Amino acid sequence: GKRLRSAVTKKQKARSDMRVYSATNIGMKRKMNQDYVFASQTPVGNLPNLFAVADGMGGHNAGDYASSHAVRILVDEIREDTDYNPVKVIRHAIETANTEIIEQAQKDEKLRGMGTTMVVATIVGQYAYVANVGDSRLYVADKQLRQVTRDHSLVQEMVRMGEITAEEARN
């Protein structure tokens, strides 16, 4: 839908000496970590590599299921896609994962309310193609840590519109 279109894939200059790290933290409020990470520095479908992080929501097993299942759908869709345009490939895979998660949540009462954020990247030549939905973030570290994605959240939208400051959003 409309929110997904706002997750337009970005093209960023990439370095060839790339190292990939992932870290998740359950935080102090949650009892279960609903994060799911996928990283492949070898080809996935027509993409030369693929990196994805999803953070589920929806309580108990539903959020955990949403994040892991969404990434599995994403990877399967990318493997089967015959297009070579990374923007189209990633967008189609995210849209498919989104549709399937919504449909499953509607069919199964135990999964009602589930959802997931997602950030996806692929490095093609000198460029990184990045897409995100929700508030899962992608950072690049090169002497300093730099956030590449912009959160899709009510608070971030309030900051963008000038209704609150970034400092107020952090507190």
Task: List each language-model region with its residue ranges.
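PP2C/PPM-type serine/threonine phosphatase catalytic domain
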Residues: 1-171
